[in-house]
């Protein structure tokens, strides 16, 4: 055993000793919840100040021809940023080799770095670099893996739901930050909204270095390996290599087989069509702040009302997302999917109406939160639950992965569509055009 391995073993043994302390688990859940909050803030911060960012970087005013062209062009370029997802599976696999703790820390600090680069930018190029960094680190969700590997089996789903609900509700902070820190006469103040999320990302990421231990599952597996002799390690590596080769041979062409299965079976073909339409219909979630700004620009909404919407909708989203999970268990998949689709459609209709007519901002905020709660709940159901239950065991993982790939295609289309709408119809027409386009898809 090398000196490096001895140090690693000592560290892992100390971590193992912590796993049985009740107070450590409670403390760990608190840290993981804050990481989840950072994740949600990073995911939503760009959308919360989208119009201010464009006005600042392109030196234009909301609703002008220059703004519409700039917003559309930036949207098309930003769509290309999502190509970074192509290397995401390879990055995620490193957590199996080097441990969850390291990547919990890297992802959390990485989100902070992405946001920091974005606010330091005074040109579009550097801003896009920040967007790419944020986009890369957001979807990894190591905090969820931590909960699944550290929590007792009977409490895992409950803890995942609670931490997710808290994180969703925390997005209301962005509305508060817009109210406190953004000066509408100085669009460059959008950067102030990022400051607290950046600080939170760095503080909790650095704190995790000293306070978070490796997960019990990885610790046990790694200690077993370190305690092996050289001969045992060599034998284990040969066995694992043989298993990988056998699995590779077994699954050769598995993606093609999955697509073949999807489009040769009535049930999965229908799911695939719904999955693409659903992904396409999520397009309005990327333009909600612009839809709200249209209300201000046309004089049907005050700045205070818009900030109320931004602060209120996350509470509704968090509450109804939790309710949607319980409803699925009680009513079953099909009934729940129909109800959740109705939530999304009705919510979008009322939200769009609230952006064009003078109604109570709490109603408008409720409608948007209600809509996206239904949308994301049905998304999880379609891509994971229903797809998984409709595929045979031997290709189930490949079918689920292929269905998610189809969803990404739908998402790419909606981003391009949104950008073209912005360039052709203009910002002032967004509430009408997006609602007329996306609402019928939800009904279908």
Pin down the residues of each PLM region:
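Conserved MFS/SLC helix-loop-helix module at the cytosolic interface between two early adjacent transmembrane helices
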Residues: 86-122
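Extracellular/periplasmic helix-loop-helix junction of adjacent transmembrane segments
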Residues: 49-87
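C-terminal ends and interior cores of transmembrane alpha-helices
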Residues: 109-122, 343-358
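Hydrophobic core of transmembrane alpha-helices in multi-pass small-molecule transporters
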Residues: 125-138, 362-378
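Extracytoplasmic gate region of multi-pass secondary transporters
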Residues: 46-48, 265-321, 411-415
């Amino acid at each position: 055993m090398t000196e490096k391995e001895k140090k690693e073993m000592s560290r892992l043994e100390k971590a193992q000793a912590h796993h049985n302390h009740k107070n450590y688990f409670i403390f760990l859940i608190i840290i993981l919840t804050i990481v989840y909050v950072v994740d949600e803030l990073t995911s939503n911060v760009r959308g919360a100040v989208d119009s201010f960012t464009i006005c600042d970087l392109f030196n234009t005013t909301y609703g002008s021809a220059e703004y519409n062209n700039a917003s559309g062009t930036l949207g098309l370029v930003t769509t290309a940023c999502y190509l970074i997802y192509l290397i995401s599976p390879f990055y995620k696999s490193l957590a199996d080799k080097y441990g969850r703790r390291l990547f919990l820390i890297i992802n959390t600090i990485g989100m902070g770095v992405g946001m920091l680069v974005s606010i330091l930018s005074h040109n579009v190029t550097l801003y896009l670099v920040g967007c790419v960094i944020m986009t890369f680190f957001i979807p990894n969700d190591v905090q969820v893996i931590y909960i699944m590997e550290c929590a007792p089996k009977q409490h895992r789903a409950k803890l995942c739901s609670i931490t997710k609900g808290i994180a969703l509700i925390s997005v209301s902070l962005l509305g508060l930050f817009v109210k406190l820190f953004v000066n509408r006469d100085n669009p460059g103040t959008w950067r102030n909204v990022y400051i607290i999320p950046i600080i939170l990302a760095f503080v909790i990421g650095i704190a995790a270095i000293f306070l978070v231990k490796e997960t019990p599952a990885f610790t046990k597996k790694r200690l077993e390996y370190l305690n092996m002799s050289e001969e045992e390690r060599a034998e284990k590596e040969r066995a694992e290599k043989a298993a990988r080769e056998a699995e590779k041979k077994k699954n050769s062409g598995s993606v093609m087989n999955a697509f073949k299965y999807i489009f040769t079976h009535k049930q999965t073909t229908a799911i695939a069509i719904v999955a693409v339409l659903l992904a396409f219909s999520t397009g309005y979630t990327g333009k909600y702040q612009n839809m709200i700004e249209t209300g201000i620009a046309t004089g049907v909404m005050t700045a205070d009302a818009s900030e109320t919407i931004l602060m209120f909708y996350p509470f509704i989203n968090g509450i109804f997302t939790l309710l949607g999970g319980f409803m699925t268990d009680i009513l079953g998949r099909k009934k729940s999917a129909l109800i959740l689709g109705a939530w999304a459609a009705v919510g979008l209709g009322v939200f769009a109406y609230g952006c064009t007519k003078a109604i109570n901002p709490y109603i408008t905020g409720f409608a948007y939160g209600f809509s996206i709660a239904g949308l994301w709940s049905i998304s999880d159901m379609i891509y994971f639950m229903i797809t998984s239950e409709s595929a045979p065991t031997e290709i189930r993982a490949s079918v689920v992965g292929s269905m998610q790939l189809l969803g990404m295609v739908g998402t790419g289309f909606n981003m391009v569509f949104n950008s073209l709408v912005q360039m052709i119809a203009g910002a002032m027409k967004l509430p009408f055009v997006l609602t007329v386009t996306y609402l019928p898809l939800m009904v279908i």
